[in-house]
Amino acid sequence: MNIFYLHEDPIQNAKWHIDKHVVKMPIEYAQLMSTAHRMLDGEMYLGKTENNRNIKRWRLDDEREDILYKASHVNHPSAIWVRQSVENYYQMYRIYMATLAEYTYRYGKIHGSTKPSITLIRPPKNIPKIKGTPLPQCMPDECKVKYNPILAYRNYYIVEKNSFASWKNRSKPEWYIEKDIMNTWVGD
């Protein structure tokens, strides 16, 4: 679970997602927003996992119940961030939609997690109507850059995602350098 934030513009951000993330992240982005809906607007109950363990679940009393994903990774910093403010939620939605479009551009297909997009366009009813908060940097400390999640996530791509970084039908981002030629990296 993460939010790969490589550029302020969601369309450019999606273009710079590596292939693996263009495939994987739309579902995670939809899960993050679904979790916000369930936790903020739903009623908590104890459910069972496939292994018969107790698990907290949230039931919605409207059409969202059958459309949205189940709550997931509720205490992850990215999940907390999405539900902290309506501005955060809308930023996540724009990233999600741009990544869905990028998937179609690269692979010529509609991503499977497009289904909840119409429902997710509306934020949870009970989300705080406050300004956005800083995006969490969910990565090793060596990649983090204080007050700059964009540079931090670019570092993260270079340091941690180098072995499988590829961009189908896209040029490599100009900021992307190969890890083996990197001497030191910017950080704070």
Predicted segments, located by residue:
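Sequence termini and other peripheral, non-core segments
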Residues: 1-75, 79-188
